[in-house]
Amino acid sequence: MARFDDNPLTVVAAAAPEEAGRVARLVLGPVLALGAAERDRLLDTVETWFAAGGSAEAAGRLLYCHPNTVRYRLRKVEALTGRSLSAPQAVAELGLAVRAIRLEAAEK
């Protein structure tokens, strides 16, 4: 069960899973079309970057890779999705999309 104080985006995704899944496929479509290893690497990087407060350095420590590797992967997500991680709306859309994908996978 998702609680609001855990993460508001997770609550939104859990409250309307079909819509959240549709948004996730719209936002992350090109990423989801990649092979499993690359897709998971990029989704893990975005998710970890969020958990690290948007810090490539902190995300790199959590992922056991160089911060430039994190930045490279994030640029790849930006290129594939057409969304800039410096634009607040795009960040919110990507955050919701990643959480929706994770919830969808957990339910399977």
Located regions from the model:
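Cytosolic nucleotide-utilizing catalytic cores of signal-transduction proteins
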Residues: 1-108
